[in-house]
From Swiss-Prot:
It comes from Homo sapiens. Residues 170-253 bind DNA. Residues 153-164 have a biased composition (Low complexity). This is Transcription factor PU.1. The modification Phosphoserine is found at residues 140, 146.
Length: 270
């Protein structure tokens, strides 16, 4: 027998020693059968050299079941693993959906801001032309002066009649100067010293003169003497009219008197 093996080219295998522990081949084949689905094709090819295995052999405990009831273990996933995978996928999706905010917004990515539209609603009350005296009353509180007089805001000197320009707008000091020189409303205003330009208002008819001044300006609201006196006291800042210590008395500046006299010579009263 040994000679025949040598002639055929097979290596000689010495007989097993008596010290070796024999093993149960049935137990080894049974364990191999249980892990057979996890063996690769390479492992199956090498296993043919060591033992004979029949893939259709079914364990004795499962002989009563049909063969088609068995599925390979690789296609079965435990429900615990599926839940774990789904939980991991949801966490990854949450991380991807969450925008990354830099630690310093000023140094990170720029965020574009959209302008907010603001609708302008029309005013409920009709627009009213503001007068010089009313504007001064809104911007400065009234001062406690005699006979209801108060400081206010009044624009600078305007154009005098006869001067070149588009539409002429008469000022309060010019309106009073024209009344004094024409003698109109002498019961409401009169000269104290014409040469010095000092004049005085009547304590009884001063409101009538103020009302006429409101009509001259075209104000919708009623003009009062308090508003008119506020504008006159404001002329003291620009120098056209100044307040005299005497009650209800004011004085024109020499420049206003000179310009008024020049205008009177150009356009004498009718």
């Amino acid at each position: 027998m040994l000679q025949a093996c040598k002639m055929e080219g097979f290596p000689l295998v010495p007989p097993p020693s008596e010290d070796l522990v024999p093993y149960d081949t049935d137990l080894y084949q049974r364990q191999t059968h249980e892990y057979y689905p996890y063996l690769s094709s390479d492992g199956e090819s090498h296993s043919d050299h060591y033992w004979d295995f029949h893939p259709h052999h079914v364990h004795s405990e499962f002989e009563s079941f049909a063969e088609n009831n068995f599925t390979e273990l690789q296609s079965v996933q435990p429900p615990q693993l599926q839940q774990l995978y789904r939980h991991m996928e949801l966490e990854q999706m949450h991380v991807l959906d969450t925008p990354m905010v830099p630690p310093h917004p000023s140094l990170g990515h720029q965020v574009s801001y959209l302008p907010r539209m603001c609708l302008q609603y029309p005013s409920l009350s009709p627009a009213q032309p503001s007068s010089d005296e009313e504007e001064g009353e809104r911007q400065s509180p009234p001062l406690e002066v005699s006979d209801g007089e108060a400081d206010g805001l009044e624009p600078g000197p305007g154009l005098l009649p006869g001067e070149t320009g588009s539409k002429k707008k008469i000022r309060l000091y010019q309106f009073l100067l024209d009344l004094l020189r024409s003698g109109d409303m002498k019961d409401s205003i009169w000269w104290v010293d014409k040469d010095k330009g000092t004049f005085q208002f009547s304590s009884k008819h001063k409101e009538a003169l103020a009302h006429r001044w409101g009509i001259q300006k075209g104000n919708r609201k009623k003009m009062t003497y308090q508003k008119m006196a506020r504008a006159l006291r404001n002329y003291g800042k620009t120098g056209e009219v100044k307040k005299v210590k005497k009650k209800l008395t004011y004085q024109f500046s020499g420049e206003v008197l000179g310009r008024g006299g020049l205008a009177e010579r150009r356009h004498p009263p009718h």
